[in-house]
């Protein structure tokens, strides 16, 4: 099986390169896939460096590499990369405007953690990112999260936050929020953690 992956990787198949990395055939394959523009490889490589992997002369060089790969993944349309980049910016006092952009974009793509972050911020529970308050959308998105099955923190947060949000809203606003949730579910991708096929 690995021989096929090697053949495909040598032909430029970035998925095969990631397979080789997961099969512990070397970090070089993940680096090649990232350099070739594979957004999953880019966010994985950024995460690997952030966790202390790889060798860098200075911490500053490591941070530049982390930022480079998270940004590349985000700009390539990867919702996981978007959230990793938004978190990187938040942890490093980055622009709140840019953080808001990536959180909202990842939420619109269905990333569960992004939807949770976006919903709590627009509902001001709390508003760490300075979003304008939108209780209807915040409740609607929180409701969608609360309906998820299978575990995870976001659904639990959703179920816990709904009553808090309801206290701040009129019955008409809650009804409007339920319609918002229906419309969002119809017009956006299904909510997902975007778990990688070959690893974590």
Question: Where in the sequence are the language-model features?
Answer:
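Inward-facing hydrophobic residues that define packing positions of alpha-helical scaffold repeats
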Residues: 30, 45, 70, 85-86, ...
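Alpha-helical solenoid scaffolds that mediate protein-protein interactions
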Residues: 8, 33, 72-73, 106, ...
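Structural signature of tandem alpha-helical TPR/SEL1-like repeats
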Residues: 22-29, 55-69, 92-102, 132-137
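Terminal, low-structured helical/coil segments at or just beyond the last alpha-helical repeat
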Residues: 153-200
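Short helix-capping/linker turns of helical repeat alpha-solenoids
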Residues: 6, 10-13, 35-39, 51-53, ...
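N-terminal leader/linker segments that initiate helical-solenoid repeat arrays
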Residues: 1-22, 200
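Hydrophobic face of amphipathic alpha-helices that form TPR/SEL1-like repeat modules
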Residues: 19-24, 44-53, 82-92, 117-126, ...
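TPR/TPR-like (Sel1-like) alpha-helical repeat modules
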Residues: 68, 101, 131-156, 175, ...
């Amino acid at each position: 099986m690995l021989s096929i992956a090697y053949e495909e990787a040598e032909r430029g198949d970035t998925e095969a390169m990631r397979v080789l990395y997961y099969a512990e055939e070397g970090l070089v394959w993940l680096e090649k896939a990232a350099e070739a523009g594979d957004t999953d490889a880019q966010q994985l490589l950024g995460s690997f460096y952030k966790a202390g992997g790889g060798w860098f002369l200075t911490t500053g060089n490591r941070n530049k590499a982390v930022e480079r790969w998270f940004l590349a993944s985000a700009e390539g349309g990867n919702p996981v990369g978007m959230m990793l980049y938004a978190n990187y910016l938040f942890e490093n006092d980055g622009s709140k405007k840019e953080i808001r952009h990536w959180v909202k974009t990842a939420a619109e793509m269905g990333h569960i953690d992004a939807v949770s972050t976006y919903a709590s911020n627009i509902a001001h529970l709390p508003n760490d990112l300075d979003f304008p308050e939108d209780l209807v959308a915040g409740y609607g998105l929180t409701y969608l999260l609360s309906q998820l099955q299978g575990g995870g923190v976001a659904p639990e947060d959703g179920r816990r936050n709904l009553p808090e949000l309801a206290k701040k809203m009129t019955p008409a606003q809650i009804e409007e929020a339920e319609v918002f949730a229906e419309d969002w579910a119809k017009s956006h991708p299904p909510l997902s953690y975007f778990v990688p096929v070959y690893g974590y």
